A protein has these predicted regions:
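Short, well-ordered secondary-structure micro-motifs within conserved domains or adaptor modules
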Residues: 38-53
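Extracellular/periplasmic catalytic domains that process cell-envelope and extracellular macromolecules
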Residues: 35-40, 61-65, 83, 110-113
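Catalytic zinc-binding patch centered on the HExxH motif and its immediate surroundings
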Residues: 49-67, 108-109
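Solvent-exposed loop/turn segments at secondary-structure junctions
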Residues: 49-54, 76-79, 97-99, 124-126
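Propeptide-to-catalytic entry region of secreted or membrane-anchored zinc metalloproteases
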Residues: 1-38
């Protein structure tokens, strides 16, 4: 998460989640089974009740095969499927396509041409969710790179 001072930022240390995952699951076995099945990456989804902002964690190092997405569920709320999709897609390379992660011009371009793009927000109605060509390309689901992608690729997300 970007703003630690925000009231939406979770006070729970990210490493706590990683430790809990390692305690609850045989991560080495998960990696082995996934790789044997021909998977490039595995994702773990955590739903935590409480205040916070949903986010994805990219593991680095020896176990970079595993990625985690943490999703906060406020008490008695309905979690939208788009939040799950949005956070999970980060683990496979998708970028946030909203401000401040993108310029206002880029956000407006996506809103105009791909209004259902899930990386704009995970809070859109499920039936309207879609993936833009940029998101498909970032995740490696297509090799077709369009010229307009250049405006979205930054030093931080290369």
């Amino acid at each position: 998460p970007d703003d630690i001072d925000s009231p939406n930022y979770s006070s729970i240390d990210v490493n706590t989640y990683l430790e809990l995952i390692d305690e609850q699951f045989d991560i080495e076995k998960l990696v082995s089974v996934g790789k044997d099945a021909g998977c490039d990456k595995a994702a773990v989804l955590i739903i935590a009740e409480g205040k916070g902002r949903s986010f994805a964690i990219h593991r680095t190092g020896e176990l970079d095969f595993i990625g985690e997405a943490v999703i906060y569920e406020p008490h008695n709320s309905e979690l939208q499927a788009g939040v799950f999709v949005h956070e999970m897609l980060h683990l496979f390379g998708a970028d946030d396509l909203y401000h401040p992660h993108q310029s206002e011009e880029n956000v407006e371009f996506i809103k105009e041409h791909y209004p259902g793009e899930v990386m704009l927000s995970g809070h859109a109605p499920t039936e309207s969710l879609a993936l833009s060509p940029y998101t498909l390309w970032r995740m490696g689901w297509t090799d077709e790179r369009e010229e307009w992608f250049d405006a979205f690729v930054t030093e931080a997300n290369q």
